[in-house]
């Protein structure tokens, strides 16, 4: 091995080409392996003379953590070498640049795109959390993209990372101020939950175009960090309720009120359950077996629900599958299940309309008994608006939002209602509305899977999947 001299560094076994970027103590180059494979890699070149004690510790931590982990959404450390002048980290090459550039060239990301990226980032963080590793410098510049064509996120730059149990506390200031949790600045005392705040800032920037503490000066930034004001979300662009809920819970200034790691990983907007994986096909197949059984028993509603849940796993299974022949086989099966779902949808839709007509008398009586309860009457009016909205084509999400708003009120009123006929009617109405909302939610999940359904779009199936799993 030889040092860099005045040109590009030289490293045995590799040809270094263009410079990709540079940081405080390292420069990253694109390189090719001299082997027959001509593998493309990124080489992080750290000049020994630039290292102080803290940067040596950071570098050793990065090597220690990365050499022991393998995950599809974490940049892989392939090897490391050194000579008299430099230390070289030979890394997986990510051709798509970083997430910061990706966001800013598009100004903002659609919610559906941000959701897929967040799912991938959450998967990487779950993997690290299970090993008590905290990144401590999460920001878009440290999140790389595998390519610009169907990019996958790759978490990088573990220089500040630490082995931290959830109850461990640190006092050393680490990270970038725009993405740094308030407790790191205000208290100089923090734990693993700072990564959750940073995730919230990244998501906020992806959806709104800039971080919540974007400032023109450092003093303005410090004032915003030290403020006690609640982080307010812009009204535009319009986001789903689940997305706004997650953002607000991530961006809690007080870490004791911030969403927990387990609740973050389980959050419905993150939806780790439906990430493309080697298990996706097996999960889809198991649900289809249950669907066929219910279908044979004549339970059309249960069968349709199970077919739709199965399709929720077939879409990521198609994304995960790389073998063309197996992909075609999966596609053929999906076509069969879509056809059967279409038939079941007609049966269930007809049945639901009949049930709604049957329930009209009870609903009208409940409204009569709610005349002296303006709050109850208002909540029932919202429920009626939800039912009307559900009848409009393409308004399923609006209907679900109204159902959820109505149920939020009705459940509180039900808990406070005294025993009697009105309570019985209210209980029945709540059960009916919850069933409608839950069923509608299942159908919307397929419609919301934009990127996951992209492969199906090309194969002409996604519209069939979406329409089959949505009752009109």
UniProtKB/Swiss-Prot annotation:
GO biological process, any: regulation of autophagy
Residues with the Phosphoserine modification: 176, 350, 384, 464
Main subcellular localisation: cytoplasm
Domain MIT: 281-347, 376-444
GO MF, any single term: protein serine kinase activity
Any Pfam family matching the protein: MIT
Residues annotated as catalytic: 137
PROSITE patterns: PROTEIN_KINASE_ATP, PROTEIN_KINASE_DOM, PROTEIN_KINASE_ST
Annotated keywords: ATP-binding, Autophagy, Cytoplasm, Kinase, Nucleotide-binding, Phosphoprotein, Repeat, Serine/threonine-protein kinase, Transferase
The keyword Nucleotide-binding belongs to this UniProt entry's keyword annotation: yes
UniProt keyword Kinase present: yes
EC number: 2.7.11.1
Subunit structure: Interacts (via protein kinase domain) with SUFU.
Name listed for the protein in its UniProt record: Serine/threonine-protein kinase ULK3
Species per Swiss-Prot/TrEMBL record: Rattus norvegicus
Designated gene of the protein: Ulk3
């Amino acid at each position: 091995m030889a040092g860099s001299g005045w040109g590009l560094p030289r490293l045995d076994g590799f040809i270094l080409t263009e410079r990709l970027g540079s940081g405080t103590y390292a420069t990253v180059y694109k390189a090719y392996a001299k082997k027959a494979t001509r593998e493309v890699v990124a080489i992080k070149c750290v000049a020994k003379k630039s290292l102080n004690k803290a940067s040596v510790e950071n570098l050793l931590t990065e090597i220690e953590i990365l050499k022991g982990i393998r995950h599809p959404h974490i940049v892989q450390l392939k090897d490391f070498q050194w000579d008299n002048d430099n230390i070289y980290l030979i890394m997986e090459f990510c051709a798509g640049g970083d997430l910061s550039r990706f966001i800013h060239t598009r100004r903002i990301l659609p919610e559906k795109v941000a959701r897929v990226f967040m799912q991938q980032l959450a998967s990487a963080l779950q993997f690290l959390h299970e090993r008590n590793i905290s990144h401590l410098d999460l920001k878009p510049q440290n999140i790389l993209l595998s390519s610009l064509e169907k990019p996958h996120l790759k978490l990088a730059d573990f220089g500040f990372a630490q082995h931290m149990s959830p109850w461990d506390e640190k006092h050393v200031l680490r990270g970038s101020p725009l993405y740094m949790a308030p407790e790191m600045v205000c208290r100089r005392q923090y734990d693993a939950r700072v990564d959750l705040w940073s995730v919230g800032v990244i998501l906020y920037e992806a959806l709104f175009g800039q971080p919540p503490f974007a400032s023109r000066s450092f003093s303005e930034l410090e004032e915003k960090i030290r403020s006690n004001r609640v982080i307010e979300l812009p009204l535009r662009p319009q986001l789903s309720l689940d997305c706004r809920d997650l953002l607000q819970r991530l961006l809690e200034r007080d870490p004791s009120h911030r969403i927990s790691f387990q609740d973050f990983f389980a959050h419905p907007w993150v939806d780790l359950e439906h990430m493309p994986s080697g298990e996706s096909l097996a999960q889809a197949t198991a649900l289809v077996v249950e669907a066929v059984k219910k279908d044979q028993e004549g339970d059309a509603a249960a069968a349709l629900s199970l077919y739709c849940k199965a399709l929720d796993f077939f879409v990521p299974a198609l994304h995960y599958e790389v073998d063309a022949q197996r992909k075609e086989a999966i596609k053929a099966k999906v076509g069969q299940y879509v056809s059967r779902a279409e038939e079941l949808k007609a049966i269930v839709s007809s049945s639901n309309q009949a049930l709604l007509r049957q329930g009209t008398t009870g609903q009208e009586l409940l409204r009569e008994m709610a005349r002296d309860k303006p709050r109850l009457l208002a909540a029932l009016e919202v429920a009626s608006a939800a039912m009307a909205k559900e009848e409009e084509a393409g308004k399923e999400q609006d209907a679900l939002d109204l159902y959820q708003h109505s149920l939020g009120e009705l459940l509180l009123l039900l808990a406070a209602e005294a025993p009697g006929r009105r309570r019985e009617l209210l209980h029945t109405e709540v059960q009916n509305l919850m069933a409608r909302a839950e069923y509608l939610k299942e159908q919307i999940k397929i419609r919301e899977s934009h990127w996951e359904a992209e492969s199906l779009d090309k194969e002409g199936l996604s519209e069939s999947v979406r329409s089959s799993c949505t009752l009109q």
